[in-house]
């Protein structure tokens, strides 16, 4: 027995040292070839991925992987690394000189070396695109599922993340812990917030904003907003002062949350971001902890960088990985261009509305409003005519704190001018002075924002605001009423800023679209409020992450690729004239995704074979197709329904190519699989094209597979 163990150790040592010898040789050559200036350059943090699998798809133990890393570090003369990865990735982050970087890149034992970079979060301030308000009303779903949120942390004191009754069954495989930190004890986690971790070595603790917390506590607000949309508790009251905006539930309110803080606040908010070394470490930890869904709303770098390779390791561990496409349309293509990530673009919708009706006149103006309660008839006053003694007229018009005379404002609706201070700060000033409502008017422009205000509020564009002000200047003793407006038939469209897929990419991106403008979410107390609207593909990705949790809870035997297929193939096309590379499969549909009929499954190891080039794209069983002019693409579908079903196929939407499906029809028993081919016949001249292959079941089930044909 001892001899067998010794033999295994000798074999392991030989396996480790054989490729490492190349590192030492490479170091000697690089030192000789690099110019003196480069040899003397300071060390920088780099991410190093070793060539051996070292992922959750490998049977190598963590001990073996660490031994390999030790040998590479030693031979390259690298000091103690900042991070080491053994679950989603086999690699490390370390300070490297240019000499060490080039030597490692030349070594057979190393597959990738890249510098640590800071990525931005994929959201925008609400006023850049807040056009819809969504307060989900579902009270159940996601029981037993843990969603890992890689982001800026979480606000644990918010009632959306409280340990409440009714969370349902306990998670089966999660083993994460509660990492202590500033103002965060090791016992701060519970049945809802099941684990937290934080990683700052890549970003640098010395670069943090003074208000930042060396813990999982969120000060930016982004991570809290995302987590609240994904899995916030059910039926939590949304309010700011006496003004109610209804009740809030996350998409999967019974799901548990694990927060992995890898995004940090800098002194200048423009420098906020997420270092790639911290991101990879967070992904590695989440994979080791055993989350069921992983949500990452970070703008991507290169197509298959270290972050994407770590996400591959997560996918190989049967984790549904959901990523934000990014908000840089016209400047860059969609992030997370990997087939193992469900990449989400954003939908824009109508602004939620309210009406201010002036009594005794025909003046009735509609603007942005999130208020769900009416004020009743009340005096309406101009803020500039209601100022305190000593306050400047400009300050009073903007409803700055202390500028409003309570004797003139109490019980009234106050007309405030936009600018100078925050919009919500204005309604707070009105409330403190005794006002019961606010009309916010633009100085210029028509952009209107539906914020969560402390009094019922309607936000008017400049033209309507000027009409109201002119009327009140002529009629001083006037009453008005604020009330919500019911909207009907307003359709969503692809957000203009949502990043499109690369027409020359390997896979179709984004995969799906979801609501991404003016999405209501919780924010940490440090921001000065409890609720705020946010916009961006991060909001959309949060929605899809919640849907993934619902599917995993409902269908506990479904693999991650099955969930990914169900989300994409049941989506509905958005009829707004945008291309497949803007919307992928289209708008996600919750009810349809729960009953997809047919799914496309990816076999274990196929993603990695595809990445290595040994499996062609036409054979990777993804729920979308990126074709090259004339070609034949093979896909396999499986019936996950409870009865035998007949399906017929169509190929539609193609302008320049002839596309057919063979066979044209399938009959499948429950659990049965079948292969079909998509045959693309080229056009006379090379031209891009797109369309859809659709399978329709006898009971109305629709399975849509988007197809993009590149030139």
Predicted segments — roles?
Residues 78-146, 153-167, 339, 453-455, ...:
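Autoinhibitory propeptides
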Residues 36-122, 409-410, 436, 640-641:
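Inhibitory N-terminal propeptides of secreted protease zymogens
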Residues 83, 450-474, 508-514, 553-629, ...:
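C-terminal subdomain of the subtilisin-like protease fold in secreted/lumenal serine endopeptidases
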Residues 227-231, 235, 423-454, 513-581, ...:
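Hydrolase catalytic cores
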Residues 145, 274-276, 294-298, 375-462:
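Extracellular/luminal Protease-associated
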Residues 277, 281, 287, 326, ...:
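Secreted peptidase-domain scaffold signal
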């Amino acid at each position: 027995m001892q001899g067998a163990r010794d033999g295994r150790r000798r074999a392991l040592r030989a396996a480790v040292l054989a490729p490492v010898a190349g590192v030492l040789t490479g170091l000697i050559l690089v030192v000789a070839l690099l110019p003196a200036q480069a040899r003397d350059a300071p060390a920088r943090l780099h991410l190093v991925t070793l060539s051996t699998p070292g992922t959750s798809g490998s049977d190598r133990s963590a001990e073996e992987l660490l031994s390999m890393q030790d040998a590479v570090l030693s031979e390259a003369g690298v000091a103690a690394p900042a991070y080491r990865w053994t679950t989603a990735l086999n690699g490390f982050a370390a300070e490297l000189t240019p000499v060490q970087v080039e030597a490692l890149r030349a070594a057979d034992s190393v597959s990738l070396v890249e510098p640590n970079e800071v990525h931005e979060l994929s959201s925008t301030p609400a006023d850049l695109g807040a056009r819809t308000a969504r307060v989900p009303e579902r009270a159940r779903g996601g029981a037993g599922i843990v969603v890992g949120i890689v982001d800026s942390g979480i606000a644990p004191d918010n009632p959306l993340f409280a340990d409440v009754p009714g969370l349902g069954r306990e998670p089966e495989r999660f083993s994460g812990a509660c990492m202590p930190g500033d103002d965060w004890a090791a016992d701060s986690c519970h049945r809802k917030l099941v684990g937290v971790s934080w990683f700052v070595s890549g970003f640098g603790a010395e670069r943090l904003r003074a208000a930042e917390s060396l813990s999982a506590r969120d000060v930016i607000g982004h991570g809290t907003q995302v987590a609240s949309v994904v899995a916030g508790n059910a039926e939590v009251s949304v309010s700011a002062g006496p003004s109610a905006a209804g009740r809030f539930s996350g998409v999967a309110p019974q799901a548990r949350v694990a927060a992995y803080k890898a995004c940090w606040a800098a002194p200048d908010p423009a420098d906020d971001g997420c270092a790639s070394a911290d991101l990879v470490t967070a992904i590695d930890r989440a994979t080791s902890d055993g989350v069921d869904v992983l949500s990452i709303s970070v703008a991507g770098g290169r197509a298959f960088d270290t972050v994407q390779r770590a996400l591959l390791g997560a996918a190989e561990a049967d984790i549904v990985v959901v990523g934000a496409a990014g908000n840089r349309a016209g400047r860059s293509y969609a992030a997370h261009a990997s087939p193992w990530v469900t990449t989400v673009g954003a939908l824009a919708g109508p602004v939620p509305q309210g009406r201010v009706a002036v009594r005794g006149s025909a003046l009735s103006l509609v603007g942005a409003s999130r208020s769900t309660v009416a004020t009743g008839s009340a005096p309406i006053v101009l803020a500039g005519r209601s100022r305190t003694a000593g306050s400047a007229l400009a300050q009073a018009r903007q409803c700055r704190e202390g500028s409003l005379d309570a004797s003139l404002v109490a019980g009234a609706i106050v007309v405030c001018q936009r600018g100078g201070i925050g919009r919500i700060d204005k309604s707070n000033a009105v409330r403190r002075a005794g006002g019961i409502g606010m009309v916010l008017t633009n100085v210029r422009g028509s952009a209107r924002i539906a914020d969560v205000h402390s009094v019922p509020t309607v936000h008017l564009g400049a033209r309507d605001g000027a009409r109201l002000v002119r009327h009140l200047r002529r009629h001083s003793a006037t009453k008005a009423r604020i009330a919500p407006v019911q909207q009907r038939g307003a359709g969503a469209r692809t957000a203009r800023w949502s990043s499109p897929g690369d027409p020359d990419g390997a896979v179709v991106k984004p995969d799906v679209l979801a609501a991404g403008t003016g999405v209501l979410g919780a924010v940490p107390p440090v921001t000065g409020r409890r609720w705020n609207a946010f916009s961006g593909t991060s909001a959309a990705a949060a929605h899809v992450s919640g849907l993934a949790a619902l599917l995993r809870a409902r269908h506990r035997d479904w693999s991650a690729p099955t969930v990914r297929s169900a989300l994409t193939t049941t989506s509905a096309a958005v009829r707004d004239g945008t291309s497949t590379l803007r919307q992928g499969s289209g708008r996600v549909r919750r009810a349809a995704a729960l009953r997809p009929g047919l799914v496309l499954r990816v076999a274990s190891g196929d993603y990695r074979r595809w990445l290595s080039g040994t499996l062609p794209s036409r054979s990777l069983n993804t729920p979308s197709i990126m074709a090259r002019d004339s070609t034949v693409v093979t896909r396999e579908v499986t019936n996950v329904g409870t009865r035998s079903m007949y399906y017929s196929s169509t190929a539609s939407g193609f302008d320049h190519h002839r596309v057919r499906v063979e066979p044209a029809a399938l009959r499948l028993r429950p659990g049965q699989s079948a292969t079909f081919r998509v045959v693309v016949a080229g056009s006379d001249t090379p031209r891009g094209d797109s369309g859809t292959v659709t399978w329709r079941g006898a009971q109305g089930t629709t399975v849509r597979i988007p197809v993009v044909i590149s030139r």
